[in-house]
A protein has these predicted regions:
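A generic structural signal for short coil/turn motifs at secondary-structure boundaries
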Residues: 9, 45, 61, 205-206
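Non-catalytic surface loops within mature trypsin-like serine protease
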Residues: 9-11, 150, 200-202
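Short glycine-/small-residue-rich flexible loop motifs, especially phosphate/cofactor-binding loops
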Residues: 82, 117, 163, 183, ...
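Active-site-adjacent mobile loop/cap segments within catalytic or ligand-binding domains
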Residues: 130, 135-137, 174-211
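Proline/glycine-rich low-complexity loops and linkers
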Residues: 161-176
């Protein structure tokens, strides 16, 4: 895989972020335990990638010191990433393209997260990339991290490839590494999946870089 996330153009972990609301483990949601078929060979041309801009609609996500909301940072970053991947020949889907709840307003955590994963699974995606911004009660904490859940054999590989390209983007406090996370969207996606934490919105400098 080679997936480039250029956050500068858009603009351990204290908090494995709560994606939507904290769901209980679900049953009956499409996309359990790596049953899908996906391609890891070759370049990006012809690959199917689903991008998930975190939060949206009734869920603002984390909020920075100036009031900047996570949902308003993840969407333009995701749109930029979509364009960059398409320019390299990938077919890209997004779980949302506007400021909306994916399942519907004020959905339960399981419904909202399940709706996002189901989009990736329905398109038989080769990779799922969820974009988020971290937050912590210490405003000096910062940096970029990538989470994975080892279910397909390629999740950690994808996380490492992406993290190595984005870890030292100017304006952010460096490399927080890859970390395994028992997160719903990573567990329930059929394909290799990562969740990228592009800095800390609680850090004034990083909030500024995200705008």
């Amino acid at each position: 895989y080679r997936i480039v996330v250029d956050v500068q153009k858009k603009g351990m972990a204290p908090k494995p972020v709560n994606y939507g609301k904290k769901p209980s483990p679900a049953t009956g949601i499409a996309g359990s335990k790596g049953s899908g078929k996906y391609s890891t060979s070759g370049g990006l041309a012809g690959k199917v990638i689903t991008i998930d801009p975190g939060h949206g609609g009734s869920d603002p996500g984390a909020i920075g010191p100036t009031g900047y909301q996570e949902k308003n940072a993840t969407l333009p970053i995701s749109k930029y990433l979509k364009s960059a991947l398409e320019a390299r020949g990938a077919k890209v889907y997004m779980t949302r393209t506007t400021d909306v709840d994916v399942y519907g307003p004020n959905a339960s955590g399981v419904d909202e997260l399940g709706a996002r994963v189901n989009i990736a699974n329905a398109h038989n995606s080769d990779a799922f990339v969820s974009i988020h911004i971290n937050s912590f009660n210490n405003p000096t904490v910062g940096g970029i991290a990538t989470y994975y859940y080892a279910k397909t054999g390629n999740d950690a590989r994808l996380a490492q490839k992406v993290q190595s390209q984005i870890a030292n983007v100017p304006g952010f406090n460096g490399d927080r590494g890859i970390q395994e996370g028992n997160l719903y969207v990573l567990r329930h996606s059929n394909m290799p999946a990562i969740l990228v934490e592009l800095g800390f919105i609680s850090n004034p400098n990083e909030e500024r870089a995200l705008k």
